[in-house]
Amino acid sequence: MSIEIPAGLTELLQGFTVEVLRHQPADLLEFALQHFTRLQQENERKGAARFGHEGRTWGDAGAAAGGGTPSKGVNFAEEPMRSDSENGEEEEAAEAGAFNAPVINRFTRRASVCAEAYNPDEEEDDAESRIIHPKTDDQRNRLQEACKDILLFKNLDPEQMSQVLDAMFEKLVKEGEHVIDQGDDGDNFYVIDRGTFDIYVKCDGVGRCVGNYDNRGSFGELALMYNTPRAATITATSPGALWGLDRVTFRRIIVKNNAKKRKMYESFIESLPFLKSLEVSERLKVVDVIGTKVYNDGEQIIAQGDSADSFFIVESGEVRITMKRKGKSDIEENGAVEIARCLRGQYFGELALVTNKPRAASAHAIGTVKCLAMDVQAFERLLGPCMEIMKRNIATYEEQLVALFGTNMDIVEPTA
């Protein structure tokens, strides 16, 4: 069955996506409602303008013939210009209590959003040297605090985040100094450490202030993600300090490391016996919904008897699998016996997802452990077609339980 994409849908969604990336709204649904409502209102105004123009022509003719009053159309030329500011992670000012919807420049066609081709595999790790700008402990702590809520960095693992912090350099600015200028090529992404800044957008050659930053926020990442000129001028209105990240380092850390991580996840998925029947496209979907979790030494990952909500693949570290036997005591204080250990690339927790039964065993971290996790909803949505194949492995697990405990039902029942 072929599905025809309605005309204009792609451009509509692309425009909305860019606005979300620029403004990073806390309430995405409210932002979407305001965004599309505004678009609808603008279309209605344009229709009214066309109707008004036709009405004015008819009215002028009527006035010439019979002295009638000319009808009035909509005069957009008298309306103030509204425009976007370049705002990747704009934070609300301390006194602001509500989210303000972004404004759109209705007179300028949206510029193309594109980027030069970039292949992370073309760079060799051996040829790269890690960029480090020395920082004091206080500077590093302030920088880490400033970066913790930036969307671009939320999915970075601790090692990648450490690389970002090392590579960021401090830029001191004076009052009145231009940090970036509208139309210039984007070279750096900036995080505000301290200071106030105004956002200016040129309209008919005249710059107009459309917003400001007050000791927090970030800007410039759109120019690093896409090959597009700066959309605004940022001017310091007080002495301040910024942390900058250059284009090359940004692309290497964010893009290349994510590409390497994705390949690693794909290799993990390919190695799982119960997923071997999946097509390549299906495996890629699995990779898209996988999340990562880090556990400290001795921390419980899953508990025997709990309801199953996800299964895990060990990315790094070692996991200890234990099981309690009903009515029997063991040498361990908690009455559990160790039945297995999982290392890098091995998985656990999938049996409960197949059988819809409570967890049959517990898992604890040995040292620091990083796991890939897929929740049960995504599991059922994506892996439904291969459930029967997965169930073929149940016999193997039941044989292991029988060998260990004499029966495959000899586990502690979950307590209410």
From Swiss-Prot:
In its keyword annotation, does this UniProt entry include Membrane? yes
List the residue ranges of the region (Disordered). Answer: 53-97
Q: What keywords does the record list, in alphabetical order?
A: cAMP, cAMP-binding, Cell membrane, Cytoplasm, Membrane, Nucleotide-binding, Phosphoprotein, Repeat
UniProt feature coiled coil, ranges: none
Q: Which residues form the signal peptide?
A: none
UniProt: 3',5'-cyclic AMP 1 binding residues: 152-273
Chain residue ranges for the region called Dimerization and phosphorylation: 2-151
Please describe what this protein does. Answer: Regulatory subunit of the cAMP-dependent protein kinases involved in cAMP signaling in cells. Type II regulatory chains mediate membrane association by binding to anchoring proteins, including the MAP2 kinase.
Q: How does it assemble?
A: The inactive form of the enzyme is composed of two regulatory chains and two catalytic chains. Activation by cAMP produces two active catalytic monomers and a regulatory dimer that binds four cAMP molecules. Interacts with PRKACA and PRKACB. Interacts with the phosphorylated form of PJA2. Forms a complex composed of PRKAR2B, GSK3B and GSKIP through GSKIP interaction; facilitates PKA-induced phosphorylation and regulates GSK3B activity.
What is the name of this protein? cAMP-dependent protein kinase type II-beta regulatory subunit
- The protein's organism comes out as Rattus norvegicus (Rat)
